[in-house]
Amino acid sequence: MKIYIIRHGETNGNLRGVLQGWTDEPLNSKGRKLAQITGKCLASIGFDIAISSPLSRAYETCEIVLRENRNPVPTIEVDDRLKEINFGCWENLGITKKNYQIPNKNFNLFYTNPFLLENSYDGESVCDVCHRTEDIYLELISKPRYRDKNILLATHGFALRCLLRQVYEDKTDFWHGKIPDNCAVNIIDVVDGKGTLIGDDLIYYDKTLAVNPYTPI
C-alpha cells in the first residue's frame, strides 16, 4: 500500500496570512494551477481510492489532481477526519507581523510546539486533530478494503502533520522544519502494517511559487 497525502493548493486566505481552519475558503487561480502541475506529475500513478477533507480547497485540489491522471480514477470520498484544525473564534484573524490579531500572546507556540498552545475556547486542541487523523490512518492500514492499494488523501497543513506523526521517527518535532507548502505531497509506504515515509514534502512546481506567510513573529 502507498498513501499519497497532498496539502490543498493556494487560497486567498493563505495570501492574506489568516487562520482558515474550518472556514471554507476556495482555491484561487494559482492554487488551481499548482494542483494541475502536481496532478500532471502524478499522472502515471493509478489511484485506487481517493479521500478528501470536505472543505472545498482540499476537495477541488483532489479533483484537479485526478483530472490529470492517465488511469481510470476513483470517485472521491469525503471524510471529516481530514479537515483542518478548527480554530473557532480565531478563524480569519491575521497572524503576520502586518496584520496580527490573535488574542493570545503565546501564539508563537503554534510554530514551535503547538502542544503547549492553549486553543481558543471554541476550537479544537492539537490532541483532538491528532486523534482523528490517527483514527483514519489506522483504519487505512488495517482494513482489507485498502490493502495493497494506492490511496490519495487531500487535506490541510496542520492535519497533514498530525497524520504524519504516525510515521515520523521524532514525534517531538511537530512541524519537521516548516508548515508544508501548498500542494506538497508526502508518500507513506505501508508493508505488513508498518508505514515508512518515502516522500517528504515533495513539490512538483517551481519553488519560487510557494507562498508561506505562516512563520513566527
Model regions and ranges:
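Extreme N-terminal starter segment of soluble prokaryotic enzymes
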Residues: 1-4
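Active-site metal-binding loops of divalent metal-dependent hydrolases
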Residues: 9, 157, 201
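Loop-to-helix element that buttresses phosphate recognition and phosphoryl-transfer chemistry
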Residues: 10-60, 122-134
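Phosphate-coordination/substrate-recognition cap region in phosphate-metabolizing enzymes
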Residues: 37-107
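Alpha-helix capping/helix-boundary segments
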Residues: 57, 159-160
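GST-like fold's C-terminal all-alpha helical module
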Residues: 129-157
